[in-house]
Structure formats: C-alpha cells, structure tokens
Swiss-Prot record:
SUPFAM superfamilies (alphabetical): MoaD/ThiS
Organism: Laribacter hongkongensis (strain HLHK9)
NCBIfam families in the record: PRK01777.1
Name assigned to this protein: Protein RnfH
InterPro entries: Mopterin_synth/thiamin_S_b (IPR016155), RnfH (IPR005346), RnfH_sf (IPR037021)
Domain of life: Bacteria
UniProt family annotation: Belongs to the UPF0125 (RnfH) family.
Pfam family, one: Ub-RnfH
Length: 108
C-alpha cells in the first residue's frame, strides 16, 4: 500500500525485439539498485548481470546506490556489441575509399 512517503519511479530494459517498462511505488530513499530488484526484471531477463550492469536515469549514467527521486526512470543498459572507436574508424576508412574513386574517368 502506498504511503505519503512513497515515490513513483519506472525501471526500463530493452532488447532489440522487446522492451519492458515497470512502474513502481517505492519508499523515499530507495536506490536505483533496490528499484531494479523490486521491478522483477532481473528474474524476467536472466541475462542481466546485477553485479556488472550499467544503469542510468534518463540517459545519464549513475551508480547503483543513487537515491531515486519522484518520477525517475531507471534504465538498465545492455553491453556494447561493438567497439565504438572501431566502428568510427571503419566508417572513416569506407568514406576515404569512396572519395578516392569518385570520378568516371572521362575528365582529364
């Protein structure tokens, strides 16, 4: 039962094919880690590693012991599947290759 000291928060987790958003009423002073545990998402998605998961509140990275405020949305982030630097490097190389051979050969 909700009391006047309860706050409303959301916990979100997304896979490419499925997204979950759980709305909760939690006591004031609840941490992001506590809200994730209360959401049931760790049971629903056994692939989430509670010890190493990266989390944020509205796209801003936070620590698991961050105390939540009214209407916060805790987001559980999946691990990256590609190194961002390697992806940028590959795109830059592909762009250079396209620019080198850009003519049709008819101009001197």
């Amino acid at each position: 039962m909700a009391t006047t000291d309860d706050i409303s928060v959301e916990v979100a987790y997304a896979l490419p094919e499925r997204q979950s958003l759980v709305r909760l009423k939690v006591p004031a002073g609840t941490t992001a880690r506590d809200a994730i545990g209360l959401s049931g998402l760790l049971d629903q998605y056994p692939g989430i590693d509670a010890d190493t998961m990266k989390i944020g509140i509205f796209s801003r990275p936070v620590k698991a012991d961050t105390v939540l405020r009214e209407h916060d949305r805790v987001e559980i982030y999946r691990p990256l599947i590609a190194d961002p630097k390697a992806v940028r490097r590959a795109r830059a190389e592909a762009g250079k290759a396209m620019k080198k051979g850009g003519g049709d050969g008819d101009t001197p």
